[in-house]
Regions:
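Nucleotide-activated chemistry modules centered on ATP-dependent adenylation/adenylyltransferase
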Residues: 1-185
């Protein structure tokens, strides 16, 4: 199926739902955390990056889902008292995640751009067969939301972007995404 383009608020974005996506992620992290906690006897915490920006489209990004998931984990396993489960961005958005990332990079003396150039949230990543490089698109909802967060943060996204014509500049991305955002104000 074709990945829809535009803003998350549009009804067609429900086509981007991956069934049980966050349950898959949480099941893996819960299993690893429980194994570590059991082996070491130490508190072991997990965190999922689900955030409020996704509530409208993804049912597994809501507090009710998180609580039910944690309950199922605790009911379905022994010795879970040393496993913590956090969803720090449940009431936040991608901007909040970036803002915390910026602070943590500074605190850890890590270059923010070196970290975020290695990330890609695109639902339609573009592969350049000549250079063997991956690019983010700027048209899918996940990319629009990411660009919006970087704009709010006041810094350019270090990740490379492209469209059907090839690599594009950050300025081009900002121009195109600003048009999409203006339609949804």
């Amino acid at each position: 199926d074709e990945v829809p383009e535009g803003h998350y608020e549009q009804d067609n974005m429900k086509a981007t739902v991956v069934p049980n996506r966050n349950k898959i992620f949480s099941s893996i992290t819960q299993a690893v955390a429980l194994s570590v906690a059991t082996e070491t006897g130490e508190q072991t915490d997990i965190a999922l990056g689900i955030h409020a920006g996704d509530h409208a489209i993804y049912p597994d990004c809501r507090q009710e889902w998180r609580d039910a998931d944690d309950h199922a984990f605790r009911m379905g396993n022994w010795d879970v008292e040393n496993v913590g489960y956090f969803t720090p961005y449940l009431d936040g958005d991608k901007f909040d995640i970036l803002k915390d990332g910026e602070v943590l990079c500074k605190d850890l003396n890590i270059d923010f751009d070196d970290v975020y150039v290695r990330t890609n949230t695109s639902y339609k990543p573009i592969f350049d067969e000549d250079t063997f490089e991956w690019y983010s698109d700027y048209k899918s909802a996940s990319s629009v939301e990411r660009v919006e967060a970087f704009l709010k943060l006041g810094r350019p996204d270090p990740a490379p972007y492209a469209d059907e014509t090839g690599p594009v500049t950050w300025e081009h991305v900002v121009t195109e995404v600003s048009k999409i955002l203006a339609e949804h104000e």
